[in-house]
């Protein structure tokens, strides 16, 4: 995933997007909050929490309540749970268990039964062991642009019958719509 550096700085106010805020904050100025009626919206989990059944469910509800810049509810779909290696086993339990994780009850696991999240992305280069994120299908969210298209070259050596190949390219990444990533720093 090309966006690991953006996720490592997701809560850092020194790295801002088009609305002047970090990628994940509780006060994006570019949208109206449907629930609070004020001039800000959030893609930060209300209360920082470790990855658990309850916190994941809260995040998924928050994603479904997202609004566009005019304050109208939009239908965002959660696509991928993004975690550091320390959370990969917990993430697998939460996404694949048929019943609610860690309980003796016979309750269904709604994340699994409703098919709310497809898969887990485990990023070994995340600097926080506790932060976790949910990527959505927001249009124009996390973006990759070509800085230099792929260039290929080949060179042969007549004396040794060796051939050398070379391929280079340059990409730039960033985000346009903060609704493409929701997250929490964890605990």
Regions found by a protein language model. Name each.
Residues 1-2:
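Short, small-residue-biased leader/transition segments that mark boundaries at the very start
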Residues 6-9, 101:
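Generic macromolecular interface patches on structured domains
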Residues 26, 31-65, 77-80, 86-187:
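Sequence/fold signature of self-assembling virion shell proteins
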Residues 8-26:
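Short, glycine/acidic-rich hinge or "gate" loops at secondary-structure transitions
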Residues 68-75:
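Short, conserved, surface-exposed binding loops centered on an aromatic residue
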């Amino acid at each position: 995933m090309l966006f690991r550096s953006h996720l490592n700085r997701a809560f850092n106010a020194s790295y801002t997007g088009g609305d002047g805020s970090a990628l994940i904050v509780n006060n994006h100025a570019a949208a109206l909050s449907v629930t609070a009626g004020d001039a800000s919206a959030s893609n930060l989990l209300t209360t920082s929490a470790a990855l658990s059944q309850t916190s994941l469910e809260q995040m998924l509800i928050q994603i479904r309540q997202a609004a566009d810049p005019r304050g109208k509810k939009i239908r965002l779909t959660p696509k991928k749970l993004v975690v550091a290696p320390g959370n990969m086993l917990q993430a697998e339990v939460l996404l694949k268990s048929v019943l609610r994780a860690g309980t003796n009850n016979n309750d269904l696991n709604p994340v699994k039964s409703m098919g709310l999240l497809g898969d887990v992305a485990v990023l070994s280069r995340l600097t926080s062991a506790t932060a976790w994120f949910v990527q959505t299908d927001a249009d124009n969210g996390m973006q990759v642009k070509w800085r230099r298209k792929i260039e290929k070259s080949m060179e042969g050596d007549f004396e040794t019958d060796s051939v050398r190949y070379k391929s280079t390219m340059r990409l730039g990444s960033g985000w346009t719509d903060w609704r493409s990533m929701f997250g929490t720093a964890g605990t």
